[in-house]
């Protein structure tokens, strides 16, 4: 399978660079996986597609203000993007500077704070701060907006680039399908008899990295930490027993659940995952998916194609472009039911 199979033309004007006034104000493109039929709706119409007894699984990770600006004590400006918090004082981070800091180099953080570069791990730098990391980030850090939102972060992003149910700090990118849900909509979903459960996957900056190989089978995913608790496993078993569907909110929820069921049996799991879902890989847990529109040639578009079928997915994206849907993190959403017999690019005539 070629990466180029997942390319499509996207006008720059369709990239959403700011959130809408209301979280639930987005449009919703509904894709029926078994038939490929499309319906153009509003996000609040999601209620009509959920059934009593369904279980919605959300990712409760919390985005940290992971971008820092500063300079080396020896001179030279730099930018730090925290990838993973290792403990109360240490992180793994991307460092952008004219000259990479060497081991032992001291970094002075704008707004106050200091860190030492203690080791390098491939492209990541291990930094040790003189004070606790999370409070420092909250005080002087910037929200790590994706590279395609080519503007500085502002005060609104602190609220809007975060789900209303975010709880466990550690992500450096938002699980964006969840951004559409406000508390009023969550209450309506609960009132309909839809259950909810929460997994955690701390989204890393690697989610924005392009696929740099020609054949997708040669691509290696970055690692991210996740947790699927026994309570979630029990909730899914109860959902199955009552005939409900497992509805994943976001590709990170999909990757969490399918990572915990790699051998076909769902079990509680806590640790790193590098699961790569592309056409041809079976799904063991998820029946329906709420997701945003993803970048051309991205691993997330490949995941959606595996779930809905390649021709159905690409046709839906073509329709979304034609209808002027807003793309990416602050954009519109899809609701997709799983295609029981998905085809890949190689199955095209």
Curated annotation (Swiss-Prot):
Its annotated pathway reads:
tRNA modification; tRNA-queuosine biosynthesis
Entry's family note = Belongs to the QueA family.
Database matches in Gene3D superfamilies: QueA-like
UniProt lists the gene as: queA
HAMAP family linked: QueA
User: What GO MF annotations does this protein's record show?
Assistant: S-adenosylmethionine:tRNA ribosyltransferase-isomerase activity
Provide the function of this protein: Transfers and isomerizes the ribose moiety from AdoMet to the 7-aminomethyl group of 7-deazaguanine (preQ1-tRNA) to give epoxyqueuosine (oQ-tRNA).
Task: Quickly give the catalysed reaction.
Answer: 7-aminomethyl-7-carbaguanosine(34) in tRNA + S-adenosyl-L-methionine = epoxyqueuosine(34) in tRNA + adenine + L-methionine + 2 H(+)
The source's superkingdom equals Bacteria
Q: InterPro entries, from UniProt?
A: QueA, QueA_dom1, QueA_dom2, QueA_sf
Query: What is the name listed in the Swiss-Prot or TrEMBL entry for this protein?
Result: S-adenosylmethionine:tRNA ribosyltransferase-isomerase
Describe the protein's quaternary organization and the partners it interacts with.
Monomer.
Gene Ontology cellular-component annotations: cytoplasm
Tell me its EC number(s), please. 2.4.99.17
* Any single GO BP term: tRNA wobble guanine modification
Q: Which Pfam families match?
A: Queuosine_synth
PANTHER family in the record: S-ADENOSYLMETHIONINE:TRNA RIBOSYLTRANSFERASE-ISOMERASE
Localization, UniProt: Cytoplasm
Protein biosynthesis as UniProt keyword: no
UniProt keyword terms in alphabetical order = Cytoplasm, Queuosine biosynthesis, S-adenosyl-L-methionine, Transferase
What species was this sequence derived from? Answer: Pseudomonas putida (strain W619)
């Amino acid at each position: 399978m070629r990466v180029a199979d997942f390319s499509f033309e996207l006008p720059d004007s369709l990239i959403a660079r700011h959130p809408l006034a209301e979280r639930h104000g987005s449009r919703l493109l509904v894709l029926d996986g078994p038939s490929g039929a499309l319906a153009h709706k509003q996000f609040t119409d999601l209620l009509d597609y959920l059934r009593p007894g369904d279980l919605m699984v959300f990712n409760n990770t919390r985005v940290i203000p992971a971008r820092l600006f500063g300079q080396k004590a020896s001179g030279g400006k730099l930018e730090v993007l925290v990838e993973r918090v290792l403990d109360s004082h240490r992180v793994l981070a991307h460092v952008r500077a004219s000259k990479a800091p060497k081991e032992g180099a001291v970094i002075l953080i704008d707004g106050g704070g200091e860190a030492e570069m203690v080791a390098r791990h491939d492209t990541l730098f291990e930094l040790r701060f003189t004070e606790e990391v999370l409070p420092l980030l909250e005080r002087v850090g910037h929200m790590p907006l994706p590279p395609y939102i080519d503007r500085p972060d502002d005060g609104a992003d602190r609220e809007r680039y975060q789900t209303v149910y975010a709880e466990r700090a550690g992500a450096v990118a938002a699980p964006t399908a969840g951004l559409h849900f406000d508390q009023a909509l969550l209450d309506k979903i609960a009132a309909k008899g839809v259950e909810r459960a929460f997994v955690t996957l701390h989204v890393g900056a690697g989610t924005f990295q392009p696929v740099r190989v020609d054949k997708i089978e040669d691509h290696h995913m970055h690692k991210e930490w996740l947790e699927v608790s026994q309570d979630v496993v029990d909730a899914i078993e109860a959902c199955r027993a009552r005939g409900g569907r497992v509805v994943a909110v976001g590709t990170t929820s999909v990757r969490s659940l399918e990572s915990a069921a790699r051998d076909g049996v769902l079990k509680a799991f806590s640790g790193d995952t590098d699961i790569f879902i592309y056409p041809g890989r079976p799904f063991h847990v998820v029946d329906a998916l709420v997701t945003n529109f993803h970048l051309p040639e991205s691993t997330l578009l490949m995941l959606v194609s595996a779930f809905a079928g390649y021709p159905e997915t690409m046709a839906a994206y073509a329709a979304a472009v034609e209808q002027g849907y807003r793309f990416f993190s602050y954009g519109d959403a899809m609701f997709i039911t799983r295609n029981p017999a998905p085809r890949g690019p190689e199955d095209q005539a």
